[in-house]
Structures are given as structure tokens and as C-alpha cells.
């Protein structure tokens, strides 16, 4: 019996739990991942002519704030927009850039952007 045949025979006798453990150990040992690669495909437009259609959902991203004196005003506005507590809003502002809201209409996004900019955010 060759080496390969004996390895196949031994692997075939493993339980499911043992096979999972073997997989994890080999991933560590060889520095690889057994995960399947993920492919993202953009949805195809319903009509060929609508390739340049307008975006319908928008995201408001806090990049930071200009003036350290306006930090409190920015935190207050972030709290109003996101319904976060004081501590969470402060951490979010200090760790910018961060997404505040997604899936907004263009008008909602522009309104939030204006409020944040008026408070001193970028």
C-alpha cells in the first residue's frame, strides 16, 4: 500500500469532529484558509440604457470635526441623529471616520449632512 492510499484510508476513518479539528490544525500549520473565496457580483440593470441611473439610497459618514471647540456640538448632533447615548456618541465622534446612517433618501441625507456641518462636523 502506498503512502497516499494509507493517508486516504486513515482520513476516511475520521469522525466529522476529528476531520474538523484536522482542518483547523492544517490551516494553522500551513497558514491557509479552507473558506471558499467570496465573489461579489453587481446586479444587472433591468434595461441596458439605465446604466447611468441615479442612486436611490445614501449613507451619511462622519469624517471628523474641524474645530476641537465644536466637538460637543458635533456629539450632540450625532446623538440626535443616531439615538445613541452620550458615551456611545462621544466614542463614535472620536473614532471618526464612521458611518452614521445608511439607506437614506437623498433629501434625508442632505438634511443630516447640513445639520452635522452646521455643528462643525466634516
UniProtKB/Swiss-Prot annotation:
GO biological process: translation
Molecular function per GO: mRNA binding; structural constituent of ribosome
GO cellular component, one term: ribosome
Segments of this protein annotated with the region Disordered: 96-122
Keyword terms: Ribonucleoprotein, Ribosomal protein
InterPro entries found in the cross-reference section: Ribosomal_bL12, Ribosomal_bL12_C, Ribosomal_bL12_C/ClpS-like, Ribosomal_bL12_oligo, Ribosomal_bL12_oligo_N_sf
HAMAP family the UniProt entry points to: Ribosomal_bL12
Record family assignment: Belongs to the bacterial ribosomal protein bL12 family.
Biological role: Forms part of the ribosomal stalk which helps the ribosome interact with GTP-bound translation factors. Is thus essential for accurate translation.
Assembly with partners or alone: Homodimer. Part of the ribosomal stalk of the 50S ribosomal subunit. Forms a multimeric L10(L12)X complex, where L10 forms an elongated spine to which 2 to 4 L12 dimers bind in a sequential fashion. Binds GTP-bound translation factors.
Protein's recorded name: Large ribosomal subunit protein bL12
Amino acid at each position: 500500500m502506498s503512502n497516499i492510499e494509507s493517508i486516504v484510508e486513515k482520513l476516511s476513518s475520521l469522525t466529522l469532529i476529528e476531520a474538523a479539528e484536522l482542518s483547523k490544525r492544517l490551516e494553522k500549520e500551513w497558514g491557509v484558509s479552507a473558506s471558499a473565496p467570496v465573489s461579489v457580483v453587481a446586479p444587472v440593470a433591468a434595461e441596458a440604457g439605465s446604466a447611468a441611473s441615479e442612486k436611490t439610497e445614501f449613507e451619511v459618514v462622519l469624517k471628523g470635526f474641524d474645530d476641537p471647540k465644536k466637538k460637543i456640538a458635533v456629539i450632540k448632533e450625532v446623538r440626535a441623529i443616531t439615538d445613541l447615548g452620550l458615551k456611545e456618541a462621544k466614542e463614535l465622534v472620536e473614532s471618526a471616520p464612521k458611518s452614521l446612517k445608511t439607506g437614506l433618501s437623498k433629501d434625508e441625507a442632505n438634511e443630516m449632512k447640513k445639520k452635522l456641518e452646521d455643528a462643525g462636523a466634516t
